């Protein structure tokens, strides 16, 4: 694989993984809030 391809793809992969990480963290937070609300009711 050409090094130029890596230079082009690296920022895209980093941004994609960062977005997935943030979405996953937000989803876990929402699930935890939902479970906590379920216990309080």
Swiss-Prot record:
Molecular function terms from GO: manganese ion binding
Organism for this UniProt entry: Gloeothece citriformis (strain PCC 7424)
TM helices/strands, residue ranges: 5-23
One cellular-component annotation, GO: photosystem II
Subcellular location field: Cellular thylakoid membrane
Function recorded in the entry: Loosely associated component of the core of photosystem II (PSII), it is not always seen in crystals. PSII is a light-driven water plastoquinone oxidoreductase, using light energy to abstract electrons from H(2)O, generating a proton gradient subsequently used for ATP formation.
Gene Ontology biological process terms from the UniProt entry: photosynthesis
Keyword field: Membrane, Photosynthesis, Photosystem II, Thylakoid, Transmembrane, Transmembrane helix
Subunit structure: PSII is composed of 1 copy each of membrane proteins PsbA, PsbB, PsbC, PsbD, PsbE, PsbF, PsbH, PsbI, PsbJ, PsbK, PsbL, PsbM, PsbT, PsbX, PsbY, PsbZ, Psb30/Ycf12, peripheral proteins PsbO, CyanoQ (PsbQ), PsbU, PsbV and a large number of cofactors. It forms dimeric complexes.
Name of the featured protein: Photosystem II reaction center protein Y
